[in-house]
């Protein structure tokens, strides 16, 4: 009798992401659909593993941020991080003097980067060139006023962080990476 009552109470409701944007949901639906197609047509095993790792990382992101809104910008940062990890490991595997089996692993890592990049480019966020076009005038204004760049904080303090997501259509991580890259570029020239 108790088990019957417990079964009635344990009704599982479907999980609904109220705090995620439609672009985030569409991107995940595309990734899941690609996984289904990969299973159905027995396509590339490496692609299937990459899609599974993307879904696992997004699940971890959802668990870590269960009380926060998830949007395409957080997914962009996640996919960018995954690409960076694979590029770093590929560089280690492909260095001169590595055994052939390590080199093959490095080439597989670079193939994984291609698959992840496909999903990264499908997100409705600003490209690196568009972000650089918005950060460049800020760097130039700092250079005009200060004469040289002493630290990246001078640039970071002038970025309108509250409107980066809405107006710039960029993630904060992508803007930070662009600022640091431009800072290093102009710092060495000065």
Swiss-Prot record:
Q: Per the UniProt entry, what species is this protein from, by scientific name?
A: Komagataella phaffii (strain GS115 / ATCC 20864)
- Give one Pfam family, short name only: YqeY
Keyword check for Mitochondrion: yes
- Provide the family line: Belongs to the AIM41 family.
Compartments where found: Mitochondrion
GO MF: carbon-nitrogen ligase activity, with glutamine as amido-N-donor
User: What InterPro entries has UniProt attached to this entry?
Assistant: Asn/Gln_tRNA_amidoTrase-B-like, YqeY/Aim41, YqeY/Aim41_N
Taxonomy, top ranks, is: Eukaryota, Fungi, Dikarya, Ascomycota, Saccharomycotina
Look up keyword Mitochondrion and say if it applies. yes
Q: Which GO terms describe its cellular component?
A: mitochondrion
Which residues belong to the transit peptide?
1-26
User: Which PANTHER family does this chain map to?
Assistant: ALTERED INHERITANCE OF MITOCHONDRIA PROTEIN 41, MITOCHONDRIAL
Keywords assigned? Mitochondrion, Transit peptide
Name of this protein = Altered inheritance of mitochondria protein 41, mitochondrial
């Amino acid at each position: 009798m108790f088990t019957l009552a417990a079964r009635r109470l344990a009704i599982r409701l479907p999980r609904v992401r109220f705090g995620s944007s439609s672009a985030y949901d569409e991107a995940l639906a595309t990734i899941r659909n690609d996984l289904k197609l990969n299973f159905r047509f027995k396509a590339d095993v490496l692609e299937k593993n990459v899609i599974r790792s993307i879904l696992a990382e997004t699940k971890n992101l959802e668990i870590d941020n269960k009380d926060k809104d998830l949007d395409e910008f957080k997914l962009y940062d996640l996919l960018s991080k995954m690409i960076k990890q694979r590029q770093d490991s590929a560089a280690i595997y492909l260095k001169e003097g590595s055994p052939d089996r390590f080199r093959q692993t490095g080439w597989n890592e670079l193939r994984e980067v291609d698959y992840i990049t496909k999903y990264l480019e499908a997100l409705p966020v600003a490209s690196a060139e568009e972000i650089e076009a918005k950060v460049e005038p800020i760097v130039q204004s700092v250079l005009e006023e200060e004469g040289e760049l002493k630290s990246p904080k001078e640039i970071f303090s002038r970025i309108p962080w509250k409107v980066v997501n809405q107006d710039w259509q960029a993630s904060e991580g992508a803007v930070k990476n662009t600022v640091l890259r431009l800072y290093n570029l102009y710092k060495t020239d000065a």
